[in-house]
């Protein structure tokens, strides 16, 4: 795992199969200490779900479209909750990865991480 500095913040990233994954957790720390809630709130947004679904459609032949439709229909509702792990486990997503442990957190493909940061 490597680090880069952006606006004075250390952001972890790593490469796998020539794909760059950037820590959403570290990006979120720049905005708020409650990183988990920030990421989950971002995932609740309908536009985020639409973007993630399109990204997975382009790059993931094993994406579970049926579960994606369930999330898309619920996105934006006050009762809708979604964690990165829930997204990955139910849709077979490859754009977001969750890691546990010392160097853990939520990582996303650079395309998705840049969307999160914007």
Enumerate the language-model features and the residues they cover.
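An anion-engaging/catalytic patch
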Residues: 1-118
